[in-house]
Amino acid sequence: MMFRDQVGILAGWFKGWNECEQTVALLSLLKRVTRTQARFLQLCLEHSLADCNDIHLLESEANSAAIVSQWQQESKEKVVSLLLSHLPLLQPGNTEAKSEYMRLLQKVLAYSIESNAFIEESRQLLSYALIHPATTLEDRNALALWLSHLEERLASGFRSRPEPSYHSRQGSDEWGGPAELGPGEAGPGWQDKPPRENGHVPFHPSSSVPPAINSIGSNANTGLPCQIHPSPLKRSMSLIPTSPQVPGEWPSPEELGARAAFTTPDHAPLSPQSSVASSGSEQTEEQGSSRNTFQEDGSGMKDVPSWLKSLRLHKYAALFSQMSYEEMMTLTEQHLESQNVTKGARHKIALSIQKLRERQSVLKSLEKDVLEGGNLRNALQELQQIIITPIKAYSVLQATVAAATTTPTAKDGAPGEPPLPGAEPPLAHPGTDKGTEAKDPPAVENYPPPPAPAPTDGSEPAPAPVADGDIPSQFTRVMGKVCTQLLVSRPDEENITSYLQLIEKCLTHEAFTETQKKRLLSWKQQVLKLLRTFPRKAALEMQNYRQQKGWAFGSNSLPIAGSVGMGVARRTQRQFPMPPRALPPGRMGLLSPSGIGGVSPRHALTSPSLGGQGRQNLWFANPGGSNSMPSQSRSSVQRTHSLPVHSSPQAILMFPPDCPVPGPDLEINPTLESLCLSMTEHALGDGTDKTSTI
């Protein structure tokens, strides 16, 4: 199908929609354009409206609180018409005029629900208000409840009147009712139609919240009456029949407080069925999709549904779908109570939101734990829990702070170029990090570069502090510290797998910047390189070692692994205690002479009889890739034999003559082969007595 044909089809649909539907659809499409496209469209619209004096006059009226307040003296038809034509022109930030609109909107919606009149117009007004940039979180939450009341009113069939047609451009004769309260045509033409009622009773002069409503709502802020008005409607447990009313009379404050909502008592508050996003009508589906922050790029809310599901709070997703990230982070129990969230649920939501606010301090604590020898597996589990929570890009979350602090971070390197390993040692001293955590000057993308294989003491600059609220940068910093420990400590397959999974999630997460993702990618490549240093067969044998870990020496593996005499080995063991399956008993028996202490032969490289410091660093940069394979040399010693575990030290000693032969393993380079050979000869040269003590 040609492009012009597609445009023709879209134009045909567009002509069939009413003005409100067209507006919602256009806004939904505009949210998908780039900034350049949006600016171009703005220029086109401004140019076309430059000579349109009528729209300027209408906009002036729409933003005058005094004029809007005078509409209360008009007929209901006139008020609905004025709201539809002026509400879209309200300027964001005009709180005084907005309050007047909300007061009128409250009265229109209450009357519409009570009398089954102006249903379609009420839907359109709700649509405009829900997508309007001038409305706040409280406004939208209250309006979403009004919309659910309106649709429940139609679905419940409380009265026998037929449901009106969806398009407001159809004739008003379809709006049944003894009082003949139908509106005219939708759009600006309503202003030209005279009211069908010759007489009317004006609005009640009270513009404040009725006492009956004030007694129920828990929100002390009564600037916007509609914020708490749905509460009495929702809490009502019985259907109170309405008293006969003069056709032109708006409901009094007492009636508004006493009348019940048209819903069943067992209907759960804020259920997905009553949300805007799950509405059954076409127009509200469009509106729901345009207002659903779960689907907006850069909103930070895309992970909220899965996060709520993990908390078993997914039934309240509709409440969060109308919020921005910043609004969600400021939720309180009092606000949730005003939205009729049950006591247990609002307490759980409030606690979960509080945990979201504490993520940065948790990440700082994790960073210190990793540096000071904490359990790496526990740290990775904490990171897994944090990455599934809603995270917003810091540059979007605090754009002004980010713009002011972009310059100090230029030292991190040019974007798009992953830093060279060793450019800045990532293994920071705990004291240094403690000093920087006490300060919170704003910064952007403050995370360490890819970890160096062997950090050099004394040459390490103090890491830049991470700004408050910059979760992606803090998360990336911890990932850098974890990568360092993975490279210099005894390898653990589960830890490495968990780390790679975390990196994959970060690489596809919208909150992380391109620079952060490139650094994470460089760390991923280093960890993958670590895994590739072992033969494939050794990796396959790992499962056999796990199953047979108790055959020869059982639980002796951990005490032996902890009896390291070398300082580096002690630090490594203290940082990351290995599980019982960490070292295969047979291989530990081969590597337990006095100079090694029963641990990985890579620790033996610190011995003066072996290679120099440079070769030691090379070895530490390329350790093994699983927790049952502490070094490459062990795999080369055992690789040519099919027995995964030897049952006695005597059986172990039968194999050393073949150890120097690397076999057909092409993955081990000659340098590592020579290291394996010299290490094995050194271990066997101490005799068999100490070997048999395992």
Curated annotation (Swiss-Prot):
GO biological process terms, semicolon-separated: nuclear-transcribed mRNA poly(A) tail shortening
Gene Ontology CC: one annotated term: cytosol
Subcellular location: Cytoplasm; Nucleus
Keywords: Cytoplasm, Methylation, Nucleus, Phosphoprotein, Repressor, Transcription, Transcription regulation
Modified residues annotated as Asymmetric dimethylarginine in this record: R602
Full protein name: Protein Smaug homolog 2
Biased composition (Basic and acidic residues): 158-172, 431-442
Annotated source species: Homo sapiens
Comp. bias (Low complexity): 200-211, 278-290
